[in-house]
Each structure stands twice: as structure tokens, then as C-alpha cells.
């Protein structure tokens, strides 16, 4: 099986004859916030002062090999491949060596090496990416709400950190995630960056603010290192 990556509706080998020869998936670096105390050996780390540590972008490096039948074909493939990767901006990058998850990647650099003869070349491509790998599949929890009724959902988040929720509701509701209550949510669907689901098992309390029955759908993508 040919080793390749997929971004959008194109794959490196199927569309550009570029197979992955090597890959380097780096861990993101921690965003450190430290303060030293004068005339002291102590250093204080405030990186998690808001309850969560934050991370720099992750670096991805792929070495591709392109083989062609003629020098002219090789040059065409190189140009097309370079144009493809250079246009990658916060897109989903799928690597078969990392099943069930993908990266949110942006093109950073392309370094072409000297052609190996007339029909083969090697190109090193670097991407920067969102620090976490994102699950391909959503987790979905649904509930029906009686008129002015209340129900609870036990939601499991196996991510490395709290993740944002997408909520779809047919009536005006109030959500309580663990011990934190939210403002009422109007009917419709939205992803709420400030509405974070903690890691582990969390009880979500849903209250219907209207005198008609409704339904709620909660979804999210797990994120891991």
C-alpha cells in the first residue's frame, strides 16, 4: 500500500504521485508563563493559572518522493504538488499512520532537494498544526425534554483537555455542566467556544424554559496529543 496523506479532496500520491518516505510528528511545546523572584532561587510557573495549560502549534514534517516517466512529467508533478500544499490553510490533514484522528494543518515550508536523476525527486514539506489531534468522528448525546421539564445526561469526554460543545435545541433551554450554569440557549444550533466540556465523566443538566416539549442534541470531537 502506498503511503500518502490526504488534505481536502486530494491525496498526495493518487493526485500527484508523491509518496511519503518519512514523517516527523512533533509534540507541541508548552506555553510557559514563569516569574522569577529577585534574590531568590525560586521560579513560579503560572502556566495553568486558569486551570488549563496551553500549547504552541505542533510541527509536522513530511518527506515525499515523486517518480515520473519523463523529466517533463516530473516537473509538472512538482509544480502541481507544490501549488497544492502551499494552499493548505487550517485544513484537515489525514495521515494513515494515525487512524481515527486528524490534524488541523497550515502550510509552512517546502524544501526541494536535487533531483535524483531525471525521473525522481524528493521534497520536504513542513506544516504547522493545531496542537491537538482531532477525532474523525463526533460523539453525540441526545435527549427529549417535556414542556418546562428537566433531564440529565452523563457525558464522557476522553480528550486530553476540555473541548467546546455544539448544541442543537428546538426550545429555549438552560444547561448546567457539572457545577457551572450557562445562560439560556435559544432554539437553533451553535458551537460555543466558552462552553467547555471537562475531561472525564460529566453530568449535564438540561432545563426546558418553554411550555412546549423539545429535544436537545449535544456533540463534540475529542482531542488528544
What name fits each language-model region?
Residues 6-12, 128-130, 160:
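Mixed-charge, glycine-accented linear interaction segment located at domain edges/termini
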Residues 47-72, 119-132, 202:
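Oligomerization/assembly interface segments of phage tail-like spikes and tubes
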Residues 6, 63-107:
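Short, acidic/charged, Gly/Pro-enriched secondary-structure junctions
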Residues 24-61:
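Short, solvent-exposed beta-alpha or beta-beta edge segments that form flexible loop/patches at the rim
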Residues 26, 90-133:
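Short beta-strand and beta-hairpin "edge-sheet" elements
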Residues 1-37:
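Polar/acidic, low-complexity leader/linker segments enriched in S/T/G and N/D
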Amino acid at each position: 500500500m502506498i503511503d500518502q496523506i490526504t488534505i481536502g479532496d486530494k491525496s498526495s500520491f493518487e493526485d500527484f504521485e508523491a509518496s511519503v518516505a518519512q514523517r516527523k510528528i512533533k509534540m507541541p511545546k508548552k506555553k510557559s508563563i514563569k516569574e522569577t523572584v529577585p534574590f531568590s532561587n525560586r521560579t513560579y510557573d503560572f502556566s495553568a493559572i486558569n486551570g488549563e495549560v496551553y500549547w504552541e502549534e505542533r510541527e509536522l514534517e513530511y518527506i515525499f518522493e515523486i517518480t515520473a516517466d519523463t523529466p517533463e512529467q516530473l516537473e509538472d508533478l512538482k509544480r502541481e504538488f507544490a501549488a497544492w500544499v502551499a494552499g493548505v490553510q487550517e485544513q484537515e490533514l489525514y495521515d494513515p499512520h494515525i487512524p481515527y484522528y486528524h490534524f488541523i494543518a497550515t502550510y509552512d515550508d517546502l524544501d526541494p532537494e536535487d533531483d535524483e536523476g531525471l525521473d525522481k525527486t524528493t521534497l520536504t514539506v513542513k506544516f504547522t498544526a493545531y496542537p491537538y489531534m482531532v477525532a474523525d468522528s463526533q460523539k453525540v448525546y441526545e435527549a427529549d425534554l417535556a414542556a418546562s421539564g428537566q433531564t440529565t445526561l452523563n457525558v464522557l469526554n476522553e480528550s486530553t483537555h476540555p473541548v467546546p460543545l455544539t448544541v442543537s435545541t428546538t426550545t429555549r433551554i438552560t444547561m448546567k455542566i457539572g457545577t457551572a450554569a450557562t445562560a439560556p440557549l435559544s432554539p437553533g444550533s451553535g458551537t460555543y467556544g466558552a462552553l467547555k466540556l471537562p475531561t472525564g465523566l460529566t453530568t449535564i443538566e438540561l432545563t426546558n424554559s418553554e411550555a412546549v416539549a423539545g429535544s436537545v442534541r449535544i456533540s463534540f470531537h475529542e482531542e488528544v496529543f
